[in-house]
Amino acid sequence: KRQPKQSRTGYVTQESHKHFFVDDIDHPYNDDENKFNWIRGYHVGGRSLTWGRHTYRLSEFDFEANLKDGIAVDWPIRYRDIAPWYDYVEQYIGVQGRPEGLPQFPDGKFLKPFELNVLEQHMRESISKNFNDGRILSNARTAHITEGTKPGLGRVTCQYRNRCMRGCPYGAYFSSNTSAKREAKL
């Protein structure tokens, strides 16, 4: 009842995590003409608490698209220029994932991937067996610690409790609260 505009998205309506988002009554905005579904956070840590933690590298395709398509302005850098920084960030925040060798999704410095469940593993094997055109099923690359710890930052391995949207008490997923804020105090 206090978030009528944000609840249109279906994202902020769960009791477990709606406290992360702005009260539309106390903090209104006018969207009558275009019905913009603006999800607005109201918490220390900003969007780093609610971003979903999907972490993909841009590829050479992304950096060269404007030049090849002849539209807009060409990027002044290429993937190879920032690849070392992707490595640094992935190691700092702890990105889990499966190296797949896909040029459109460059591999990185991943922690061990979350295990696929039985159905996902069966689908992965079936796709591999029945299609030889490069199709795959892979898990998402997300900023979750799946092995080891970052104890100085108060972060430990994911406990697989499916409570991510409530805010991880273990610091297993990356957020500014579990990492950057703590490190700034050290």
Name the predicted role of every residue range.
Residues K1:
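Glycine-rich FAD pyrophosphate-binding loop
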